Swiss-Prot record:
Further comment found in the protein's record: Heme 1 (or BL or b562) is low-potential and absorbs at about 562 nm, and heme 2 (or BH or b566) is high-potential and absorbs at about 566 nm.
Residues binding heme b b562, per UniProt: H75, H174
Keywords from the named record: Electron transport, Heme, Iron, Membrane, Metal-binding, Mitochondrion, Mitochondrion inner membrane, Respiratory chain, Transmembrane, Transmembrane helix, Transport, Ubiquinone
InterPro entries, alphabetized: Cyt_b/b6_C, Cyt_b/b6_C_sf, Cyt_b/b6_N, Cytb/b6-like_sf, Cytochrome_b, Cytochrome_b_C_euk/bac, Cytochrome_b_N_euk/bac, Di-haem_cyt_TM
Name of the protein described by the UniProt record: Cytochrome b
Gene Ontology biological process: mitochondrial electron transport, ubiquinol to cytochrome c
Organism per entry: Antaresia maculosa (Eastern small blotched python)
Gene Ontology, cellular component aspect: mitochondrial inner membrane; respiratory chain complex III
Amino acid sequence: MPHHYILTLFGLLPVATNISTWWNFGSMLLTCLALQVLTGFFLAIHYTANINLAFSSIIHITRDVPYGWMMQNLHAIGASMFFICIYIHIARGLYYGSYLNKETWMSGITLLITLMATAFFGYVLPWGQMSFWAATVITNLLTAVPYLGXSLTTWLWGGFAINDPTLTRFFALHFILPFAIISLSSLHIILLHEEGSSNPLGTNPDIDKIPFHPYHSHKDLLLLTFMILLLFTIVSFLPDIFNDPDNFSKANPLVTPQHIKPEWYFLFAYGILRSIPNKLGGALALVMSIMILFIIPFTHTARLRPMTFRPLSQLMFWTLVSTFATITWAATKPVEPPFIIISQTTSMLYFTFFLSTPILGWMENKMMNIS
């Protein structure tokens, strides 16, 4: 693999001929990132990080700023697109064994954590009712940390409750973290090009490679065009599809919403958090639901890289996908039967996938007589 990264600027990167549509999501994520930075910049020009003015400034953007409604909707729905693409990107990595390129995988999961933090801070900025209460519930989890919890929470809030200093620092963090995402993305791409992309067969593709441009770049454009078309269709016809009705009311610390929940892309982690009736246990499970992705490269025992010819792993993978969807759905429901037991069962199944990987790999080696 050439070490001259300048080649990548001209699309001369050698790529396997047989990579499928599932490899398109990297370029789609890059497009989402560019869109978010651009729309975010124009929104930041008109936004006011003050608890008395934040909600009004969002109304001002959508009503008075030329194309402000489009910028605001593109930014909000673009975030959902970003998470759809990144979850598919990670699922592809799990299915085809891309995680065996350890440095690339580690940088990717770090990117995911940074992205989740950025999205969380961004959700608080409109200072709507759900923004305020979601921020209160999630930041309050820091109090579960032994000894340091109360001090950490007070330090994060900038006071003894969520107030003006909290909003100011959340806006500052939401503005600065995308630059960290851009840096990590560059690192992710450099590390990927060091070893090269994997492929659906999991074999060494060095004998059969073609330049990224024009072959794969044109293939990427198809799905990219579809994504942009879908994004603008939702912005034009269903702009509030991902919004919570409570967030159309200004934050009121005296009135608690009937059901506090974050944006849909955090619901799987929130569902795992709620399924454990203990604050510290729930907070640990929430953190572990993401952090467990770091251990995957070290628990791979199968001799074959992708799951294409590994039926047991395939079964567990599709169980994970359905589990992810079920936890997300259950997290939108109130904490009452039967949703409690559904959340607890699916949370156990979620972690079972990661813990069973080494055993399944070993069993599949035995089934195929691969020593």
